[in-house]
Design a protein with these regions (language model features):
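Active-site-proximal specificity loops/subdomain of glycosyltransferases
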Residues: 39-128
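Local beta-strand N-terminus motif with an aromatic residue
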Residues: 1-3, 33-34, 128-129
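N-proximal low-complexity "stem/linker" segments adjacent to membrane-targeting elements
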Residues: 1-19
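Short aromatic/hydrophobic "clamp" motif used to bind/position activated sugar donors
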Residues: 132, 138
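Short, acidic, metal-binding catalytic loop of nucleotide-sugar glycosyltransferases
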Residues: 20-33
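Short alpha-helix within the catalytic core of nucleotide-sugar-dependent glycosyltransferases
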Residues: 18-22, 119, 142-153
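Catalytic core and acceptor-binding pocket of nucleotide-sugar-dependent glycosyltransferases
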Residues: 100-127, 140-144, 162-233
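Short acidic, S/G/P-rich loop/turn micro-motifs used as interaction or catalytic elements
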Residues: 11-15, 45, 140-142
Length: 233
């Protein structure tokens, strides 16, 4: 039983949250092979600065983050890229739950790049992972997820919560079969189509729209308990 774990985006609270990931996710699944694939935004010249000046509780760029990732994740493949701006002048955030459009596109680009590394590894080795997991570096699980193979992997497993609209899905953590997750995570490549189909321009609305309306994927909502590191009490 093989699991692909995808990390992406800014390495927020990576070092603080990793012991929690180890205890609540890696340990309950340590009898399985867990391979990490990651696409991370990283720019040496930003070391010491906050990820987002407006929100200092989201952490800083640190000099040893790259080394930490390679040592602790032992990734099958990892790609570091300097943050970049995405052109999207005609895409407007939904005013009910606004989120900077560049951040939205950047998030889904990074997720797509991590998943592309996974797909390339599958193609090169002529197999499919039994399960693919998308996880933020700054997630803090308040109770263990448990053994992954006890879940229905012919469905996208997500958090049971209301995420803005009926089709909205919490965008921090999800898993399912490799084939289903390839569709769940293909937002960046199809961003314009998804927007033109009527998705609200907000991360949780877009990923949920892509899964439940565009692809009509089976989705299972689970009573997990987790928060972002910055929100933990």
């Amino acid at each position: 039983f093989k699991i692909a774990l995808l990390y992406s985006g800014q390495p927020r609270h990576l070092k603080e949250a990793f012991p929690n990931h180890h205890d609540t996710f890696w340990k309950p699944n340590d009898s399985y092979q867990i391979d990490v694939f990651a696409h991370m935004w990283y720019d040496e010249k930003w070391i010491g600065n906050y990820f987002w000046d407006q929100y200092k509780d989201r952490g800083r760029w640190e000099a040893d983050l790259k080394e930490f990732m390679i040592e602790n994740w032992n990734p099958k493949a990892i790609l570091f890229e300097e943050p970049k701006e995405f052109e999207a002048e005609d895409i407007i955030p939904d005013p009910r739950f606004p989120h900077p459009v560049n951040n939205i596109i950047s998030q889904f680009y990074s997720i797509s790049q991590a998943n592309a590394l996974k797909k390339q590894y599958e193609d090169d080795n002529n197999f499919k992972y039994d399960c693919v997991v998308r996880l933020r570096t700054d997630e803090y699980f308040q109770r263990p997820i448990g053994p992954i193979n006890e879940y229905n992997l012919d469905s996208i497993n997500v958090l049971k919560e209301w995420a803005h609209v009926e089709h909205g899905i919490n965008d921090h953590f999800a898993f399912g079969s490799s084939e289903l997750m390839d569709k769940y995570l293909d937002v960046y490549e199809n961003f314009v189509e998804i927007a033109e189909m009527g998705a609200e321009i907000n991360p949780e609305c877009i990923i949920g729209f892509n899964a439940q309306i565009r692809h009509k994927l089976p989705v299972t909502k689970n009573d997990w308990k987790y928060v972002l590191w910055r929100d933990k009490k």
